[in-house]
Amino acid sequence: MRGRTAWALLALVLAIISAAQAQTPTRETLVQKLQEGTSEERQHAAGVLGDMGDDSAVPHLIDALKDDDEVVRELAEHSLWAIWNRSGDPQINALLQEGIHLIQSDRLDEAITKLDEVVKGAPGFPEGYNRRATAYYLAGQYEKSITDCEAAIRRNPMHFGALSGLGYNYFKLGKPERAIRYFERALDINPNKPRIRSTLIELKRALHQRVRDSI
């Protein structure tokens, strides 16, 4: 009797595990749902890929930034940042999060020092450069910020955050033509940035007026 009960219990446990595995979507399934699913399925896939996705999911999430569904677009952007913030090394990830917290606390010198550790520890990791670029920008060190933005883009050409960062740096340096170029590139990838779009419109208007005044 005890043996039969044990076998029955084992069979039940295996059935539960099998059912749970069947309910857990694979990355491939999520990508397919993101591309071809209903609005609700695309929303779910766009959100879950932030936790389950890796670099292979990035092109599909980039495409989802232009989805007809606003929620899908927002979740896709959130998932992109989640993936981009993961280096594959827990220690580097922790250092990055410390650097981000220091930026948010306006402790910029400390943030730069912390993000130096990220860049030295993971020189191929784009987000280390991008976050340090943000700290440099907020500290008014625009040339250093530009260097880091460019480093991030070399490692991740679709990084709309680093592209818009170049736009803001060149804007601060009084180079509107370059700023416009990078704002447009950022919006080509991620059109869901009203602040960048507004800045771009104002820049183009000011540049047009400057040309008219020079005639």
Predicted segments, located by residue:
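Amphipathic alpha-helical scaffolding segments comprising HEAT/armadillo-like alpha-solenoid repeats
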Residues: 23-33, 54-65, 89-96, 147
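Helix-start (N-cap) detector for alpha-helical repeat units in TPR-like alpha-solenoids
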Residues: 39, 92, 126-127, 160-161, ...
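Terminal, low-structured helical/coil segments at or just beyond the last alpha-helical repeat
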Residues: 98-101, 180-215
